[in-house]
Amino acid sequence: MKDVMLQTAKILLLGLFVILVWGIFHGSRRRVDFAVLRSEVQEVFGTSGMKEGDAQLLRRLYGVNGGELANWYLLTAEDNMAVEELLLVECASSEQAGQVRLAAEKRAETQKNNFEGYGPEQVQLLDNCVIQEEDPYVLFVVSELAQEVKTAFLKGL
């Protein structure tokens, strides 16, 4: 009788452990206050020489419809010869986060091609850009402070 109870207890504990581990890896996605995350990232990135992009610019540069995203923030350089850029996105789904990441990769590659041959400083910044996907958030940064912005982004999550 004790053996049966002990065996049953082991099975229940194992089942509980499996449920706990599954919950950790497949639980609900983290959600943070986007305005706070944006502020923390923006503070490190800075806004001097930058302009905020609208939904039309987001679509033109990334092929992404801003109305389909949960939240987004885009900064681009005021100077056409500068490549500094920041895109912070809260996506509505994991699939969408992957699409935004791919769009950021394509944007970086397009910019490299645009500046190849006559803009070595710009190409170097693009080579060192940060594209970070932390479901449901995506960060794209082209800046001398890209790693610092990434750190602020990860800390804010």
Which stretches of residues belong to each language-model region?
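Hydrophobic membrane-insertion alpha-helices, especially the h-region
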Residues: Q7-I24
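A short, solvent-exposed beta-edge/loop patch
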Residues: E121-L157
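N-terminal positive-inside, membrane-proximal cytosolic segments immediately preceding the first
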Residues: M1-Q7
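Extracytoplasmic/periplasmic/luminal assembly and interaction segments
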Residues: A55-Q99
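Aromatic-capped interface at the extracytoplasmic side
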Residues: F25-V36
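Short extracytoplasmic/periplasmic juxtamembrane "stem" segments immediately C-terminal to an N-terminal membrane anchor
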Residues: V36-G53
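Structured, soluble extracytoplasmic/luminal domains of envelope-associated proteins
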Residues: N80-L126
